[in-house]
Amino acid sequence: MEALIRAAQEAPSWKNSQTTRYYALVTPEKVEEFSAKCLPEFNQKSSKGAALVVTAFVKDRSGFTQDGTPDNEVGNGWGYYDLGLHDENLILRARELGLDTLIMGIRDEKAIREALSIPENELLGAVIAVGYRAINPDKPKRKTVDDILKLF
């Protein structure tokens, strides 16, 4: 888990604000208890047997001036952007280590905050399962570069 988090924290962040936070559940008992309280049944099944990482970031810092004024219209969106960069590093490192991941955005925020004592000044992102996949799903078809790129 530490190797994954080390890789995650190498990602860039707005003005080097480093607001990403991780909460890892690694013992089978903690994972089972957390899953039952905080994840819908389909995510409980999809992540069975995996460690879980809850992602969050400190709000009102990434994308904000020191006096708390948003730098632009995106505001806390920059915190989510930074969190995504960090999470991608975590996921890529997991893959390098032969581990699989599942990003779960459908979760019970209130239950997660309570279970992990996450402070109100942090906004939650995803719950990421880390382990070994039970199935090999088909990769969805990707759009072509022409569909997503406009050159000027």
Predicted regions and their residues:
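A short N-terminal beta-strand-loop micro-motif at the entrance of redox/enzyme domains
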Residues: 1-3
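Glycine/small-residue-rich phosphate/adenosyl-binding loop
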Residues: 6, 10-83
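Small-aliphatic-rich amphipathic alpha-helix that forms the alpha element of a beta-alpha
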Residues: 8-9, 54, 71-115
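Short, hinge-like loop/turn segments at secondary-structure boundaries
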Residues: 41, 119-122
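Structural motif
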Residues: 51-53, 101, 123-125
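Short secondary-structure boundary segments
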Residues: 58, 106, 132
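C-terminal helix-cap and adjacent tail motif
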Residues: 66, 126-152
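Short proline/glycine-enriched turn/loop segments at secondary-structure junctions
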Residues: 114-120, 137-140
